[in-house]
Amino acid sequence: MPMPPDDSALSLLPDHPLAAHNTFGIDATARFAARITHAAQFAALHRDPRVAHLPQLVLGGGSNVVFTRDFDGIVLLDEIAGRRVVREDDDAWYVEAGGGETWHAFVAWTLEHGMPGLENLALIPGTVGAAPIQNIGAYGLEMKTYFDSLVAVELATGRSERFDAARCAFGYRDSFFKREGRGRFAIVAVTFRLPKRWTPRLGYADVTRELDARGIAPEAATPRDVFDAVVAIRRAKLPDPLELGNAGSFFKNPVIDAARFDALRARVPDVVSYPQPGGQVKLAAGWLIDRCGWKGRALGAAAVHDRQALVLVNRGGATGADVLALARAIQDDVRKQFGVELEPEPVCV
């Protein structure tokens, strides 16, 4: 009788080029790479003498990383697939997706199966497994709103652990996995709780304007209408990484307290802002960058996109150092003009 396949077996790819595995399209090489299609492969890493001693980097869609050098370790390409409803009750569906699933495809799948809620997060690049790390968000919705739990493998021990929202400690574009847990875990599956009573989130003017352009009143909008509107907005504003390398929004929108905001508004009355809980105020980083005159400008092969100042792009041949030099120049100008610190979203490796 033939032996069943070993789901934990690891096939190593030596001197693996990474340009196709990061949306900036930055050239870098990993000492090794491995395609991970089963959680058991993550769990077996610490027992594999070929790689157990090496630095490890889990990579999903590569939409939140800037390679500044070659990676002298093993890059683990998370390709764990699968989408399913694990259970439902009178109030909600509980939907699980593999960490390697493409985020946008997963959002589209939930809508196609009559389970709305995630439509404001349509077309965000990356994978399901990367979404909790960053607590992705757009157009008035953060991933944590519908998050239920996730399963992650601790790379040093191979032990699987389940994390609820409290343990993930989500913040604005932040989580445990971006702080204390950074580099320690691989997220293999995420479960979302999607309420059966749909709550449309139409607080952003861009969304209501797009609906209006389509002849749809906000109160009449369906989940599919919102999904289509968000997709159209993102495609109009953001470059396709396959055509122009980028990592989406490069900087977080800074959040400041009311006193600092009042002082800023006294100097800059038209500053774009959004009230936040606890009296804080979120500023539009793209507006700050644009006001500093950076939209469309370049430093070498790295540039600020000409339609969205929050997006840095690779015009061809840019290195990670080029991107970081541009980012620092922008940060310096925003700090000098507005007294505000911009924090990058991508992880630099």
Swiss-Prot record:
A GO term from the CC aspect: cytosol
Enzyme class: oxidoreductase
Intracellular or extracellular location(s): Cytoplasm
Alphabetized PROSITE patterns for the sequence: FAD_PCMH
Pathway: Cell wall biogenesis; peptidoglycan biosynthesis
Gene3D superfamilies, per database record: 3.30.465.10, UDP-N-acetylenolpyruvoylglucosamine reductase, C-terminal domain, Uridine Diphospho-n-acetylenolpyruvylglucosamine Reductase, domain 2
Obligatory cofactor(s): FAD
GO molecular function, one term: UDP-N-acetylmuramate dehydrogenase activity
Known EC number: 1.3.1.98
Pfam families per the UniProt record, alphabetical: FAD_binding_4 (PF01565), MurB_C (PF02873)
InterPro entries membership: FAD-bd_PCMH, FAD-bd_PCMH-like_sf, FAD-bd_PCMH_sub1, FAD-bd_PCMH_sub2, MurB, MurB_C, MurB_C_sf, Oxid_FAD_bind_N
Reaction equations catalysed: UDP-N-acetyl-alpha-D-muramate + NADP(+) = UDP-N-acetyl-3-O-(1-carboxyvinyl)-alpha-D-glucosamine + NADPH + H(+)
Keywords assigned: Cell cycle, Cell division, Cell shape, Cell wall biogenesis/degradation, Cytoplasm, FAD, Flavoprotein, NADP, Oxidoreductase, Peptidoglycan synthesis
Subcellular location, principal: cytoplasm
SUPFAM superfamilies, sorted: FAD-binding/transporter-associated domain-like, Uridine diphospho-N-Acetylenolpyruvylglucosamine reductase, MurB, C-terminal domain
Keyword Electron transport attached: no
Active site: R173, S249 (proton donor), E345
Residue ranges annotated for the FAD-binding PCMH-type domain, each copy included: 24-197
Family: Belongs to the MurB family.
Function: Cell wall formation.
NCBIfam families assigned to the protein according to its UniProt record, in alphabetical order: murB, PRK00046.1, PRK13903.1
Cross-referenced PANTHER family: UDP-N-ACETYLENOLPYRUVOYLGLUCOSAMINE REDUCTASE
HAMAP family, alphabetized: MurB (MF_00037)
Protein name (record): UDP-N-acetylenolpyruvoylglucosamine reductase
Origin species: Burkholderia ambifaria (strain ATCC BAA-244 / DSM 16087 / CCUG 44356 / LMG 19182 / AMMD)
